[in-house]
Amino acid sequence: MYFAVIDTESLKDPRIINSFQISKVVVEYEPNSEVNKYHHIFFLKIKSYEIENKINLIAKEMKDGWFAFFWDNQFLFIAFNKQTFKVNQAMLEKDKQYLQAQDYGRSVGIQDEFLNFKKYFKRYKKISI
């Protein structure tokens, strides 16, 4: 079983979330957000055999400059609209893919404060349980 966290602000058409098994929705207040002060964060469950298709489905709908997390017990996928990085959770920020995801994020205009994937992933992983 895989899990995912998606901010619907990141999607061109957020109705795509309706095709997923939703385990939880959290509304976060982000007063400094340039997009929206309120973000709807969806926590999803995905069957292991569907993970690649579901990542691709979300990536196609994702706006530029956003990313989503998909994970199981071993790996964390950091998915952007045009590229996905597979990170070993045991190594996290020491994993080459983690560093490449940060570099890629910078190249598409994401601010460094949002590229601390470890911080955000651990927070969302805890909320999803």
Language-model features, listed with the residues they occupy:
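Acidic, proline/glycine-rich low-complexity IDRs
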Residues: 91-129
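Short, intrinsically disordered low-complexity segments
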Residues: 20-91
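Short acidic, gly/pro-rich beta-turn/loop elements at beta-sheet edges
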Residues: 14-16, 52-54, 115
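Short, mixed-charge, low-aromatic patches
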Residues: 10-15, 56-58, 105
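Short, extreme N-terminal segment that most often corresponds to the first beta-strand
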Residues: 1-19
